[in-house]
């Protein structure tokens, strides 16, 4: 049994079951790069402030560098006998360079050490997520551009509502992801604060320089309250919430891909590379990837609830409960990263059944609103026009007709103002291109939206790369 670095206070060794129960190294070992990065920064600051000698600092930094290289090459395995990754690295450092390694923890607690490690991890994770959102947005915009002339029925209540451009529909998801990126950007801003120097909760008696450490680690600011610094998990909950909303948007798209690929809709075919078959039914081609995207949304929601419940009613400052924040955060990060990677590859491989979508665009009386608008332009109050067109739809249903099948004479029986000039209002192309309001489905507006999105994505890509 490895002796703990904090063993001095205790007469008896820790119960083995307690060691197993409290250990976190099996999941927090992914933080090793950040722990070493933070320790090197802390060590250099201690030397800069003359708290430890430059010779000792050089030895410590060299030892930490060796540990990092050995871990990266798989030559060093920090086993389950270690409590967590932070203590494991410190113990390995002392094994390598002796007692001088014990000077590293001067003016530092595991509380602010862990807080720093997780913030460093989250900075990288948020940037990675934003890059993947950007890639998915690019794919959606390209798909919208390639299918600019394709018409389809727009839906409300999953019933045919009005004809729209497929490109317009796809660009709706671009807007959702745009809001998601904004949330991740704002989360990054609140994550990007240095807590190191807060120590256990009250700060430290040593003359440290938090601003120096912040500059070294590229943090624009430091925390303002040491108690809050070691107990704050808001940024993780924000990440969980932003991720939940992102996955909610992904699940909506996934659901539509599942529906659209069904025999009943037959709007699309998903590439074989993203589907699986049945163990018993030879004909089946199942949209498993979108289904799992829809399903994995639930686990991200669950992780958010775990974080909220974990931090509910916790007294200040640090409590061991907070060890439990890592797994839901790591799982959420892994889930959204893998989901976005797949989604950005799946979308370009979709084959749209353009003719089928066009045929269905006019079904279900999708031009009824346009006929009502026609009557309004003839001077009929909208509510009356709405009622008249409702009667026409009723007539068509009884006679098994579509609106465009009706003659002028038939339509005139419902209102005398209807004439030959009604027919452009009963054509899908005209119905679409008349909707020129900002954000509308008219081709000109959708082209504008695509061009605007391209400019936004170029600017975002430059911002992320810098």
From Swiss-Prot:
GO molecular function terms attached to this record: argininosuccinate lyase activity
Keyword Phosphoprotein: no
Annotated InterPro entries: Arg_succ_lyase_C, Argininosuccinate_lyase, Fumarase/histidase_N, Fumarate_lyase_CS, Fumarate_lyase_fam, Fumarate_lyase_N, L-Aspartase-like
BP term (GO), one: L-arginine biosynthetic process
Keyword terms: Amino-acid biosynthesis, Arginine biosynthesis, Cytoplasm, Lyase
Major localization class: cytoplasm
Entry EC no(s): 4.3.2.1
Cell location: Cytoplasm
GO cellular component: cytosol
Keyword Lyase included in the entry's annotation: yes
Disulfide pattern: none
Catalytic activity: 2-(N(omega)-L-arginino)succinate = fumarate + L-arginine
PROSITE patterns tied to this protein: FUMARATE_LYASES
Pfam families recorded: ASL_C2, Lyase_1
Pathway: Amino-acid biosynthesis; L-arginine biosynthesis; L-arginine from L-ornithine and carbamoyl phosphate: step 3/3
Similarity-based family: Belongs to the lyase 1 family. Argininosuccinate lyase subfamily.
Protein name as it appears in the record: Argininosuccinate lyase
Classification lineage: Bacteria, Pseudomonadati, Thermodesulfobacteriota, Syntrophobacteria, Syntrophobacterales
